[in-house]
Amino acid sequence: MNNLRVRFAPSPTGAIHIGNIRTALFNYLFSRSEGATFVLRIEDTDLERSSKEFEELIFKELEWLGIEWDEGPDKPGPYGPYRQSERLEIYHKFAQKLIEEKKAYRCYCTPEELEEDRRKAVERGDIPCYSGRCRYLTKEQEEAFIREGRKPVIRFIIPDDEVIEFEDMIKGKITIKSDTLGGDMVIVKSDGMPTYNFAVVIDDALMKITHVIRGEDHIYNTPKQILIYKALGFEIPKFAHAPLILGPDRTKLSKRHGNTYIGQYRELGYLPEAMFNFLSLLSWSPEDNVEIMSKEEIIKKFNFRRIHSANPVFDIEKLNWMNQQYIQKSSIERIVDLAIPHLRRAGYIDGIDDMVYNWLKDVISLYKDGLQYVAQITEKAKMFFVEEVEYSDETVKILNSPNSKIVLEVVKKVIEEADEITEEYVKDLLKKLQKETKVKGKEFFMPIRVAITGEDHGPELVKIIPLLGKDKVINRLKKAINLIK
């Protein structure tokens, strides 16, 4: 490890959004490709919404995806603690320092006063910003407000007419004027909790973070943070703002686009290596433009300069295609193990012994290469787990085609007489019955397929029939025969 340090700093207030996971991934890839230290920090100052359950979920999702951190709440390092709720004294110390150096002050404005200021600014056609009313309060004025029971916030003084410039590692030079930042900003709330922009600067500085890699929705936080860095005499890190992920309609990815949390994809049976691969390609591509890559290959090829500034689109079809490639390369045992919870939830299976497990392997292997995600197995293989199959109008038409009844009755009769149904037996049987009935090809196979499966396409009949078993096959043939007019 060298002196480079990056961090991922999520808030444990809910499930992790795809965009946040992509941010974690870029920090991780930077750390592993550059030999940097990767820090996990939990920003839990929102006491009402933060929970231990969501913190545990953060750990779980990162570990599932294969993102390991070097320092964090569960991996002590030299710059802990790594939860903001355990660092409150540190923030108060630096807030007091800013007050003593006349770079911050206590503000006693009421919400009503602030709302009135905002309303007047809007009426004038101005951008609402804090008026600075409390910037120069006398000691007597402060004491009077305290006697009234007002609880102050602490505001950091935003300099007038200053231009803040920084070189973004992705977007290039960014220039923002201080008079667009909303006036003197709150750094400590009336309940004593630090605001995001204040706490993040203190933490990044004291944890010696050299590169801040985050989403572009933080761009307008950066000049505020740079001013705090300067006021406290801290070294300013390098900044990189990754473009936000968009939905197919090129608006910010949200719930209306479908699943937006990483856990939803894990639960559906997307493979972690596929998600790792897919997310790494949202705004980045290797020089050779290869798409399917292992984690190790991605780390080896990763170059931060190849992250582009255009907003990537979350293409679910591309993800499904990529996940399908990984499912195809996975062992049948792995896919069966992932499928079992889905089959249990569907009520298809209960206890599993070796015989059932081996049967599941045979069933799932019929569909494995066509699965885009593992949860699809409950629908694709449904016919193996239900007693009866349903017939659509289209499949009923097939059952009522010429010669269907003859074919189904002769197949039923022969299977009823069979002692054991194996693939070899079914293969020979179907060949023999085509000769006997003089019905061949689709005209012979389609009624059987529809009768037994309820579908007009799917895996080979010679594989389906032995796996369904004699009783199910006979019962379904009987039902189909009774439907024929």
UniProtKB/Swiss-Prot annotation:
Segments carrying motif 'HIGH' region: 10-20
Alphabetic keyword roster: Aminoacyl-tRNA synthetase, ATP-binding, Cytoplasm, Ligase, Nucleotide-binding, Protein biosynthesis
Record GO biological process: glutamyl-tRNA aminoacylation
PANTHER family per UniProt: GLUTAMATE--TRNA LIGASE, GLUTAMATE--TRNA LIGASE, MITOCHONDRIAL-RELATED
Quaternary state and interactors: Monomer.
Annotated GO MF terms: ATP binding; glutamate-tRNA ligase activity; tRNA binding; zinc ion binding
Keyword NADP: no
Organism: Thermoanaerobacter pseudethanolicus (strain ATCC 33223 / 39E) (Clostridium thermohydrosulfuricum)
InterPro entries, per database record: aa-tRNA-synth_I_cd-bd (IPR045462), aa-tRNA-synth_I_codon-bd_sub2 (IPR020751), aa-tRNA-synth_I_CS (IPR001412), aa_tRNA-synth_I_cd-bd_sf (IPR008925), Glu-tRNA-ligase_bac/mito (IPR004527), Glu/Gln-tRNA-synth (IPR000924), Glu/Gln-tRNA-synth_Ib_cat-dom (IPR020058), GluQ/Sye (IPR049940)
Protein name in UniProt: Glutamate--tRNA ligase 1
Enzyme Commission number(s): 6.1.1.17
Signal peptide: none
